[in-house]
Design a protein with these regions (language model features):
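Beta-rich nucleic-acid/ligand-interaction surfaces
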Residues: 36-40, 205-208, 493-494, 498, ...
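Glycine/proline-enriched, intrinsically flexible loops and inter-domain linkers
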Residues: 7, 20, 60, 198-298
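Conserved mixed alpha/beta core segments that line enzyme active sites in large multi-domain catalysts
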Residues: 44-74, 154, 248, 259, ...
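Extended, well-folded interaction surfaces typified by the phenylalanyl-tRNA synthetase beta subunit core
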Residues: 418-580, 715, 768-772, 776, ...
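Phosphate-backbone binding interfaces of nucleic-acid-interacting proteins
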Residues: 1-210, 345, 364, 368, ...
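Terminal amphipathic helices with adjacent charged low-complexity linkers/tails
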Residues: 194-220, 397-425, 432
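Mobile "lid/hinge" segments at catalytic clefts and subdomain interfaces of large enzymes
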Residues: 116-131, 140-144, 159, 167, ...
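A carboxyl-terminal module marker
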Residues: 444-446, 594-598, 603-609, 615-801
Length: 801
């Protein structure tokens, strides 16, 4: 909280009060931690005298002045000497944990005692025992007691001197509030919440009589991806530690202090929410910065020592000859700052958020900077941040700031304007506020009224203000959500329902599960090797795939164009686990590119896939499909056309599924070689239906008919049929010639054997007739059967005797 109080000096609330109020006003606090929660009675003491312990070679006896008295403390620390100022926990006080850095809940209470016969009235502390780490306090020894600087005041609180009397607060900042990604934004919200004055840092003009433009030239080749780029130069740089107050601020935000130069860039990033970068200007070839897109396949070594390959969508920061950084993500190893740096080039820029997000994913590198840039920063913030960094360099004596700033501004962001409608705001909130009251609340967060246009003007850092509802939210936040009166809605409720496509998918699930299939879910990304495994030809459209730019691995590097691999892999897993009979289904998407390389979004198709082994055959699969079609409202006949073109299916046991002349899927037995590739030793059957292809035929306008009053009459047809005649052709004859009295038919037998002449097969149908208005007469049935038999005879079919 101390960092917040630097900009809201009158803020005087407890951590709990702060947390509750900030959350209620819209800046949600996840939690807070008091750094001194487990510390008590710890003061700065000065060692006046050290003596050897009479009975222990590794212990010493120290006389320590704690301001009010001198106490005797026995310690084994090897790093203390007479005159050192150290943290001392007194009798009855508490430390956070042991020297191993492990905190103890509630702390460890220190009592006076004897060490090898010598009384000790307290304990000198390491930084770990105070609940912190050497990373946060670089000056602390690797092992031993923490030593204060010479100007530390004996007797004062060691907790306060170390900055451990602070509270670390964790916020949950939504992505639309980019202004709150910096401490200044949070402080502005705190000032508004507690009605205190917000005092931002005053940035003074810095720099000598020289011009930065004489030191470096900047060219932005892609203004769309880099709306603003600012650069300033600092020469005669002196690398050293940053001041303690800056180190404490960074440590509270989880950033390890390094040196004054690095700490200043990190400090400004945390303060303004504006990422910065520093280059050693002497490593910049030609003293020139060029912001350009990477070349496809260009390789670059980042600060973390990793070589990364770019594509032509990644924005690079380059000098006259080479790349020196990935824009908005990370700098390069070839321009990193060392302790020997003489002249520094500061960069503060605004990059296209969408491009940074996609680039970060492509190269597999996400940083604090990219996380901020991808939200979309205010271009107007870059200049303020770089000037602040130069001001700190000058104030801390870290270098000589060169005058002027190279500022390439390709986008001037104007304040957003929203019509001010008090009546609508009151109606939306259910309040009765006056115009003046609303304006007072809005003024807290720098939203002002333009009286000439009657518009609310939002500063450029508030890019979340777009419409009247956004303005109403700001009024509600500071009026108080808890003060808004409770009212009941008076509108009419409407019944919601699932989209039509999802209803069809649910029918598919219901039918599949009713028929004994279990649902499976497989990855949408696969290995390019699956096409060979499935025996898919090299020229097949299924091999035209979308390659993932940042895959989990080679086995997940493409978007699938068929669901068969996932289904067969799942069946294989069950087969290997010795499950003897398995039925699975999946409803999942395939991704079919319209053109490669991608210029538009792919065609995403939803496939209903069935797979089984040891639990049925080709005809069982047909039955499931027909049941699904019927329950989806597809009442017309389904046609199965033999096919032999799908190389992953058995050439003599596969068929395309058609409805009203449109191919909507296929089914068949998996080719034995493909089944073997997956390690399945059983006959395996699959079916695939394209959900999008059947939607135009589906419907849920069910018609109900009463129970039939009149009896049905059944006739069996046993026929000798040429082998090339399909069951569908016979059924077409039945439907066309059966008339209105034909109720249903069912194929119940197919036979080929010695008793049937060569080139023929035996087929038998059960045909049901019924008239819903009267009892059928034998003459009607005979006449209808004659029509049917004539139609069958025309196909070369003979009736068996």
């Amino acid at each position: 909280m101390s960092w917040i109080k630097m900009y809201v000096p009158d803020l005087d609330v407890t951590a709990q009060e702060y947390t509750d109020a900030m959350t209620l006003s819209g800046t949600k606090v996840e939690g807070f931690e008091k750094l001194d929660a487990d510390l008590d009675k710890i003061v700065i003491g000065q060692i006046e005298k050290i003596e050897k312990h009479p009975d222990a070679d590794k212990l010493i006896i120290c006389q320590v002045n704690i301001g009010t008295e001198t106490v005797q403390i026995v310690t084994g620390a090897p790093n203390v000497k007479e005159g050192d100022k150290v943290p001392v926990v007194l009798d009855g006080g508490r430390v956070a944990g042991g020297h191993d850095g492990q905190k103890t809940p509630g702390g460890i209470k220190i009592k006076k005692g004897k060490l090898r016969g010598v009384e000790s009235f307290g304990m000198m502390c390491s930084i770990e025992e105070l609940g912190s780490t050497k990373e946060m306090y670089p000056e602390a020894p690797e092992y031993g007691i923490y030593i204060f600087p010479e100007d530390a005041v004996v007797g004062e609180s060691a907790i306060k001197a170390l900055g451990l009397d602070d509270v670390v607060i964790e916020y949950e900042i939504t992505s639309n509030r980019v202004d709150c990604y910096g401490v200044l934004g949070i402080a502005r919200e705190a000032a508004a919440t507690f009605d205190k004055k917000f005092v931002p840092p005053v940035i003074k003009e810095t720099g000598n009589d020289e011009k930065a433009s004489d030191y470096v030239k900047v060219t932005v080749e892609d203004p769309e991806l880099c709306p603003r780029y600012t650069a300033r130069v600092v020469k005669n740089v002196k690398i050293g530690p940053s001041p303690k107050w800056m180190q404490r601020c960074l440590a509270s935000n989880g950033i390890r202090p390094i040196n004054n130069l690095v700490d200043i860039t990190n400090y400004v990033m945390e303060e303004y929410g504006q990422p910065m970068h520093a280059y050693d200007l002497d490593t910049i070839e030609g003293r020139e910065i060029v912001v350009r897109r990477a070349k496809a396949g260009e390789k670059f070594v980042t600060l973390d020592g990793q070589e990364r390959e770019m594509d032509d969508q990644v924005l690079m920061i380059c000098d006259g000859k080479k790349a020196v950084g990935i824009a908005g993500i990370m700098g390069g190893e070839n321009s990193m700052i060392t302790d020997n740096v003489h002249t520094v080039l500061f960069e503060a820029a605004c990059f296209n958020g969408t491009n940074i997000r996609l680039s970060s994913k492509r190269i597999g590198l996400r940083t604090d900077a990219s996380g901020k840039f991808e939200k979309g920063l205010d271009p107007n913030n870059a200049k303020a941040a770089i000037d602040r960094a130069c001001q700190l360099m000058e104030e801390l004596g870290a270098g000589e700031v060169v005058g002027g700033c190279v500022d390439i501004c390709n986008e001037v962001r104007e304040p957003s304007r929203v019509p001010f409608e008090p009546e609508r705001i009151n109606a939306l909130l259910g309040t009765d506020l006056t115009k003046e009251e609303m304006l007072a609340y809005l003024a807290k967060v720098e939203l002002t009224l333009d009286p000439e246009t009657n518009e609310i003007v939002a500063p450029t850092f508030r890019q979340d203000i777009h419409c009247m509802a956004d303005v109403a939210e700001e009024v509600a936040r500071f009026f108080g959500y808890d003060k808004i009166p409770t009212t009941l809605p008076n509108g009419e409720a409407t019944t919601g329902k699932l989209p039509f496509k999802l209803r069809i998918e649910n029918v598919a699930r219901d039918i599949a599960e009713y028929c004994g299939f279990s649902e499976g879910m497989t990855y949408s990304f696969e290995s390019p090797k699956v096409f060979d495994k499935l025996r898919i030809p090299e020229n097949s459209d299924l091999r035209k795939v979308i390659t993932i730019s940042n895959p989990l691995g080679e086995d997940y590097s493409i978007m699938r164009t068929t669901t068969l691999n996932g289904m067969l892999s799942s069946l294989a897993t069950n087969y290997n686990r010795r499950n003897k009979a398995v039925r699975l289904y999946e409803i999942g998407k395939v991704y079919l590119p319209k053109a490669l390389p991608l210029t538009e979004l792919p065609d995403e198709r939803t496939h209903f896939t069935l797979g089984m082994y040891g639990a049925g055959d080709f005809f069982d699969m047909k039955g499931v499909i027909e049941e699904f079609f019927e329950k989806s409202g597809m009442k017309k006949k389904v046609h199965y056309t033999p096919d032999s073109n799908k190389t992953y299916l058995h050439p003599g046991r596969q068929a395309n599924i058609s409805y009203e002349g449109k191919v909507v899927g296929y089914l068949g037995e998996v080719h034995p070689l493909v089944a073997g590739n997956y390690g399945i030793g059983e006959r395996t059957y699959v079916a695939v239906i394209d959900i999008q292809d059947i939607l135009e035929f589906c419907g849920f306008n069910h018609k109900f008919t009463g129970i039939a009053k009149y009896p049905a009459v059944t006739r069996d047809l046993s026929m000798v049929v040429p082998k090339h005649i399909l069951a569908g052709q016979i059924e077409d004859v039945l439907e066309q010639r059966g008339g209105k009295i034909l109720e249903s038919y069912q194929l119940f037998d197919i036979y080929e054997g010695a008793q049937i002449k060569p080139g023929y097969k035996s087929m038998a149908y059960s045909v049901v007739f019924r008239d819903h208005e009267k009892t059928l007469e034998e003459a009607e049935i005979t006449a209808t059967m004659k029509k049917i038999l004539n139609g069958l005879t025309a196909l070369g079919i003979e009736l068996r005797s």
